[in-house]
Amino acid sequence: MEGINNNSQPMGVGQPHHPVNHTRPFFYVQPPSQPYFMYQWPMNPYGHYGFPGPALHFGRPYMAPYQFMQYPGYVIPHAPMQPIDYRRINPHYPSVASYDLRVRHHFQNAGMHRETACSEVQTDPSDSVNKLIDKIESLKACELGSDKGPNNVVSSTPDVVQGEKLTRLNEDSNLEVATKECKEDPVTRPTTYSDSAYDAESSQGRLDECVFSDVLPLDSSSVHEEEEEEEKDVNEEDEPQTVADEICSQNEMSASTTSNVFCSGVQSIADPTECHDLEKLGDEQKQDIPSADAAAVIEPLISLSEDFDLPYQILRLPCNKTTTGLSLEREIDPLVYFDSPSTLLPPQNYLSSIGSAYSYSYYPQVTQERQSVLSPSIDELSSRDEMFSTDVEDLEVVPGHVYVGGGRLAEASDMPVRSRKELPSVDKTCSVCQKTCACCGSTLQDEVGMCKMAEHSHPERDEMSDQDCDYDLEAEVRSNCESPRVSKRKCCSRHALPSCGHHCAKHRHRKLLCEGQESCDLREQARVHPKGECCEEYGALAKADKRIQKGALCRPCIEQQWREGVVSDQENWASCGAKPRSWRQVTGPQDQGRTPLRRSTCKSIHQQRPRSEYNDYDETEFTYCQRGRGSMKKRGSRY
């Protein structure tokens, strides 16, 4: 028993125990620790029981002040994770009250200290406000220090200052500063020459002045001071030594400002020989820069930064008239010089035609632009195979620029646009032009002849349906020989009722003018040129496919239609000027070579859906006349 007691003593929870002799086994009973939660990863601090926050989010922290809470009745499955001892994360010493959920509100916000503040109760200024106040005070001190001379033009606020006043004020100041500094020893010059130190904050205000006063700011003042000295060389030729000293000091300033941007005082070049070399370089540079009024305005604004001893520097700022939106008079880089400002100006075609403040438009004007949202361009038309009749009214697809007029699409091309009222007269006057098949090279005229006689038979009833027939025949030949176009099959009703022509007149304007024009040419050519066998077979197959799409017909109606088409074709070839018989006549020989082939093709396909005799003859003609090229539904009732 003694060994057992001794062995059981280290079995505690880790608290130090002195070895004590016990007569019986014992256990140290301690409050249970925080449970190990197996679902670890969604641990939203504002979700209950470790569940994902969006599911149960009521603004309460995840870990309750007491660590022994009742688990919910359901558990959300999570990825397998290693258990974590949360006692090391959130140590907690449970109390008696923590075991009861009714008193959980006593421990809900324990240990949470938050400080909130809004802008209405903040009395102390923030750090940014303090920094701003300090900067303003430092600027005021700099202004007071520069009030000793009459050349105080530094302002803590960006004011728009006139260029003439700045020019007059800084000519004297630059002369005095330059002569004074060049007369000093080269050794003491780096330490005493603190007037050329760049000042960031006052130059920022000066930068705003440049923007407001339509002046192009630069990052160095040596260019403008050399331009000043170029003017002074003309006026003060009796003082060559003074001018040389000024150029020497200015070149030192330019050399030092481009090399030193870290200290408030600019290090100048101490070797006088280098000063003379820079003087020669400055003379050469002066000749390259043309004097202009813009330069005279720009000079004093940048040279102001050297007149006052401020602990700041002007760095290279990417600010010019192009980016600030002001008129671009001249853009000068202090290290690169151009003979004329034409190298910096954009070309004339980029200039904005509006005359606004911007120097040029970032986007050049497009040569051909969309005139309307509803008007497709030629590129869009060429990308498609065809514009359907349900999309655009009266369109003639010829290369050219599309113009919009009267709500329709017109075309600025050599071929005139003809309305649908002019088409019957155009059929008689169109010039004969050779049209060949793109596949076989044969002419495409024979099939149009079967509907040519329509304009001599009934000008009010048959002319409209025949014109639609010409549309369809020409579209079929083109669809089978040139490109895969979607076109309507023959809509000429062989048993036309008096209202059939009226329906055709309603929907005839849905055709494209392109097809109407080409069908006019094809009709005239039908008298001269025969048609190739390749195109005949293509037309037969195409009509068979289209009849499948539009709806199956019974056999007698199809045979009757083809018989009438053959008879009409023969009469049209025999006597073109005579008035042929009406379309209603059914009988006629079938001696055309292509007719048996086409009949057999249609006969083998269109026997799928038989109808009554009345519906066959009556509904067929209405269906053909009422359907548009891209439509599959009836457009009106039969009665």
Curated annotation (Swiss-Prot):
Residue interval(s) of motif RG Motif 3: 635-636
Entry GO terms, CC: cleavage furrow; cytoplasm
Top-rank lineage group of the source organism: Eukaryota
Listed name of the protein: Bucky ball
Annotated Basic and acidic residues bias: 178-187
Motif RG Motif 2, residue range(s) on this chain: 629-630
Chain positions with Symmetric dimethylarginine modification: 627, 629
Biased composition (Basic residues): 596-609
Gene from which the chain derives: buc
Biased composition (Acidic residues): 225-240
Record comment regarding domains: The dimethylated RG motifs (RG[X0-4]RG[X0-4]RG) motif mediates interaction with TDRD6 and is required for Balbiani body formation.
Extent of Polar residues compositional bias: 189-205, 584-593
Keywords per UniProt: Cytoplasm, Differentiation, Methylation, Oogenesis, Spermatogenesis
Residue span of motif RG Motif 1: 627-628
Knocked-out gene: effects: Mutant fails to form Balbiani body, and vegetal mRNAs are not localized in oocytes.
Gene Ontology biological process: morphogenesis of follicular epithelium; oocyte animal/vegetal axis specification; oocyte anterior/posterior axis specification; pole plasm assembly; spermatogenesis
Segments for region (Disordered): 178-205, 218-242, 581-614
Organism in which the protein naturally occurs: Danio rerio
PTMs per UniProt: Symmetric dimethylarginine modification promotes interaction with tdrd6.
